[in-house]
A protein has these predicted regions:
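Structured C-terminal helix/loop/strand segments within mature extracytoplasmic catalytic/sensor domains
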Residues: 2-140, 158, 166, 278-296, ...
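A conserved catalytic-loop motif detector
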Residues: 260-319
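Short helix- or helix-capping micro-motifs
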Residues: 212-221
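A glycine-rich, coil/turn loop motif that links secondary-structure elements
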Residues: 163-168, 202-206, 253-262
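Short, conserved catalytic-motif segment at the N-terminal edge
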Residues: 142-166
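Short, well-structured active-site flanking segments
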Residues: 183-209, 281-285
Length: 372
């Protein structure tokens, strides 16, 4: 069929070539008809070609347009990435300034005060937030002394009450001692988390790994494990570590007790150091971070009561042998911001003191918008 069509297509051309001379009017008319048909066919062919080119061009344009959109989208992502990077650099710079800040600038006294560690922009609390915090603090004062510090690590702004009241910290100090071991000894290679440690004396537990002891200390608040760690590592640089952080060594190195008496201001300094260490991308730092997020008791976590909020803490509680304490301190992460919270009280531990401490934590947390 294809060859026949091809031959038929060329017949009119031969006819028009040889029969136009000296032919009859009818023959001439036939020739004109043939020429007209040829022209029509040619026009049709040209139209098809033009249509094909147009369709192809349109198809090409449709193909190009998504590519252009993709490029634009990628450019937007790059811009956002650059903005995020700039913001990250700004945050790092702010943290650097914050790390050099004098924590003695945190105001003291038995009134709720706000402060800034990096500039003169002192925040103002909303009346409702201030009233809730004052109410929770008053309830605590009915049972003992109380002091708090709460601040935003990104802005350096915070709120405090009685920042220098010294109370028995009980188990709240255990996480900070674990910080000393990991940051100073493990990261330097002096101590291996999986290395065996002999425990002895009245609290002998046989051979334990450093990892197991720290986990028992942080997650389960085990006293025997804590005493074993202090006996093993107090003389390996602990005093220098404390001094470099600007902490009163007489408070942190009380020879009469493995559990220091200290204040919210000291707690704020040490948990700022904790935040710096946990931001490091090391096996030990990430492991310790996970332990702090898994503590068996947290008055802060109970008070905030929000699964979207990450709380890494260590609480302390006791009501026996003349020692009274209900404390909690840690790091709170929400919406890309990290806060340091320290609550130190001499309330004898009970269900009521636990509820009051949780209420203080909630009231402090609710002031965060003013600290940005």
């Amino acid at each position: 069929m294809r060859n026949n069509a091809s031959r038929d297509e060329y017949v009119p051309q031969h006819g028009s070539r040889y029969e136009t001379k000296g032919t009859s009017s009818r023959g001439l008319a036939d020739a004109r008809v043939r020429v007209t048909k040829i022209a029509a066919i040619g026009m049709l062919t040209l139209a098809v070609i033009i249509l094909g080119i147009t369709v192809k061009t349109y198809a090409s344009e449709r193909t190009v347009r998504p590519d252009a959109s993709t490029v634009q989208l990628q450019n937007e992502k790059v811009s956002k990435s650059k903005a995020s990077a700039d913001q990250a650099l700004s945050t790092v710079d702010l943290k650097t300034r914050l790390s050099k800040a004098d924590f003695n600038d945190i105001p003291s006294g038995d009134t709720v005060r706000t402060f800034s560690l990096v500039d003169n922009k002192t925040p103002a609390l909303e009346d409702e937030s201030l009233a809730s915090l004052q109410d929770a603090l008053c309830r605590a004062q009915e049972l003992g002394d109380v002091g708090v510090v709460f601040y935003d690590l990104s802005s350096g702004r915070g709120v405090t009450y009685n920042a220098d009241v010294e109370v028995y910290g009980a188990s709240s100090y255990k996480a900070l001692y674990a910080l000393y071991i990991c940051e100073t000894l493990v990261e330097s290679g002096q101590v291996s988390l999986d290395g065996p440690l002999a425990t002895y004396g009245g609290y002998s537990m046989g051979w334990q790994t450093v990892r197991n002891l720290i986990e028992n200390v942080v997650v389960n608040s085990d006293n025997d494990s804590f005493i074993a760690l202090r006996a093993a590592f107090d003389h390996d640089g602990y005093e220098d570590w404390i001094a470099n952080l600007g902490v009163d060594d007489e408070t942190a190195l009380n020879p009469m007790s493995d559990f220091p008496t200290y204040c919210p201001r000291t707690s704020a300094k040490l948990w700022r150091e904790m935040s710096e260490y946990l931001s490091c991308d090391t096996e030990a730092s990430q492991w310790l971070s996970g332990l702090l997020a898994s503590t068996s008791r947290s008055f802060i976590r109970d008070g905030i009561a929000d699964e979207q909020v990450l709380v890494r803490n260590k609480a302390g509680w006791i009501s026996e042998d003349g020692y009274y304490s209900t404390c909690d301190a840690g790091l709170i992460d929400i919406d890309g911001c990290t806060y340091v919270m320290g609550i130190m009280t001499s309330m004898p531990w009970s269900d009521r003191s636990s509820e009051v401490t949780a209420a203080i934590a909630k009231a402090l947390f609710d002031t965060r918008a003013a600290l940005a």
